[in-house]
A protein has these predicted regions:
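N-terminal alpha-helical interaction blocks
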Residues: 1-104
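Acidic/polar active-site rim loop that often engages polyanionic ligands
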Residues: 105-109
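Cys/His-rich short segments
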Residues: 112-160
């Protein structure tokens, strides 16, 4: 068996929720992490030979403020970030449908998680209650309004149709 199966059934990563509020641990994890970079259309900016993940050091030596911790797999940290944060232009992108046919299940699940989170972050820049500017917290898993204090969280469970 090739290791490939139905995409999105593998949960992908241990999301390690307690670590998201510990910047020093996030910074330490970044040094050996891998990052998934998505363009403004939600496509993955592949690293090389259709590899899903960039070495974090190629993206930035220090953890970028907009790097979202996706979780861990086999003690390896995985982060997501938008392509506009990069200092280089990605040469190739890959959509989620194409990735589902090329990548192992867990990588496709991580792609779906990254795409959903970065989309939510882009849509949550302003408070839904008062319109004030919201700041991302918890390594990208919550947004807090600077004006009224409303805290919102993404819905990260998969949809089944």
């Amino acid at each position: 068996m090739s290791g490939f199966g139905f995409a999105f059934r593998d949960h992908g990563l241990d999301r390690d929720e307690p670590m998201r509020s510990q910047p020093e641990r996030l910074d330490a994890a970044w040094t050996k992490a891998k990052g998934m970079v998505l363009d403004d259309k939600g496509n993955s900016c592949v690293y090389s030979n259709e590899d899903a993940f960039h070495p974090a050091a190629r993206i930035s030596l220090a953890r970028p403020a907009n790097a979202t911790l996706l979780g861990f797999r086999d003690h390896q940290a995985y982060f997501a970030m938008p392509a506009n944060a990069l200092s280089f232009a990605p040469s190739e992108t890959l959509g989620i449908r194409m990735a589902a046919g090329l990548w192992p299940d867990w990588q496709t699940a991580v792609f779906a998680q990254a795409k959903a989170l970065l989309h939510w972050q882009a849509q949550s820049k302003f408070c839904g209650r008062c319109g004030g500017l919201s700041d991302l917290r918890s390594a990208g898993y919550s947004a807090s309004c600077a004006v009224c204090g409303l805290v919102v969280y993404p819905q990260t469970h998969p949809a089944v149709i």
